[in-house]
Every structure is written in C-alpha cells, then in structure tokens.
Amino acid sequence: MCISTIKHYHDMSEAPDQINEKIIRFAKRFMQIIREVYGCERVYMCTMCDGPNNHYHIQLIPRYAYEKRGSGNFVKKRKAYEFDKEKFETARKLIAEYAMEKR
C-alpha cells in the first residue's frame, strides 16, 4: 500500500511539516486497519525516494507471522496478487470513516 502527496516533493524533507504530520497520522491509522483487516503480524513503513522520477511516498508493507523478519522483507519475490474484494471494501470503509473524522 502506498501513501503519496498530490503535490510533487522529492522527499520528506521538501514537504511542509503540516503535510508530513498528516501523512504520519494517516499512516498510523492505515497500519492499524491493515493489521485488523488482513491479519498480518506487523506493518513496516518505509520511504524510498531514489528513482529517476523521484516522488515522495510512503509504503506500508504487511508482514505475516509465517514470513521472515527484518529488512529482507522489503524485497520480495513477485507473486500473483490475489484480490480479496471483501477485505478491500472493509479497509476502504474504515479509511473513509477515518478521513471523515479528520475533516
């Protein structure tokens, strides 16, 4: 899962503090939702802004109990993605509720 700004920033240091604060608060809630809905053990948060078309974003990476721990989880073999509409809709509903609370 990825959280990004609409306005372009190369990395967190270029974004205004107000934007960074909102992103971190949102990421915290989104991590709780991911654990609740998808049943993962942990959610890693990272920002890697180092590509040719750099753009500030935060990645939330679920780690399940059966997966190895540590930074090796940031690079995983690609596998077929199994879309779970019910879980997706539950997460979307909870995120929308959080967004409405913060208005």
Per-region residue spans from a language model:
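HIT superfamily nucleotide-processing domains
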Residues: 1-103
